[in-house]
């Protein structure tokens, strides 16, 4: 039995998220499993580093699978990409020891959320960025983002349906930066709760619109109640961009994504 790690890029527009759903509901995981199973001539189960919501994208989702099939790495990539839909692509594949696990060996995960702040909507980036037409106080949002760094109970900032046993997470960095009309939130943590990034972004957008002051974030944390926070930002602008592992696994590190997502801070 061979174990392979894979790096996957996908647009989430047509899918109900990463995780396999009930029959007839499109998911990224099930779509890839179906293709890999055909190539391997045996059932394949993918184990992903994380789960993404419906409409959320990824530039380097890491997953792994086990198989008895023997194929060169290039053969897996070319075979899969020739059969996958155009909005899913295998970027790399690497044979691993059994010790590797895409989810449980991950030490951190990283997302970027992209906002296009302009009076008109961007037709070419439809459902790839979140369009906000209102004028935003960007400097205030930048200061507010740092409030989420460190170890906190994120009960207020997770979905009511979140299934995680405990809401405490350590956020290594939470930074907002501006490039012209683009606002990019870059956040890295040891793990994320359901809707956590989208709820944080929703909070920052409301602060940028003057709905409340930065210190109100402390009140939200203290409440430990989802109702204490504001909107959940749309999925359109959210990207899973990186997953971190111990150096011993030596996984490829591709670029973060297209130029408007790969903007330097």
UniProtKB/Swiss-Prot annotation:
Intrachain disulfide bonds: none
Originating species: Acinetobacter baumannii (strain SDF)
Amino acids binding substrate: 111
Name of this protein: tRNA pseudouridine synthase A
Function (record text): Formation of pseudouridine at positions 38, 39 and 40 in the anticodon stem and loop of transfer RNAs.
InterPro entries per record: PsdUridine_synth_cat_dom_sf, PsdUridine_synth_TruA, PsdUridine_synth_TruA_a/b_dom, PsdUridine_synth_TruA_C, TruA/RsuA/RluB/E/F_N
SUPFAM superfamilies: Pseudouridine synthase
GO molecular function: RNA binding; tRNA pseudouridine(38-40) synthase activity
EC number(s) per entry: 5.4.99.12
Active site: 53 (nucleophile)
Enzyme kind, highest EC tier: isomerase
Keywords tagged on the record: Isomerase, tRNA processing
A biological process term (GO) from this entry: tRNA pseudouridine synthesis
Assembly information from the UniProt record: Homodimer.
Domain of life: Bacteria
Family the entry assigns: Belongs to the tRNA pseudouridine synthase TruA family.
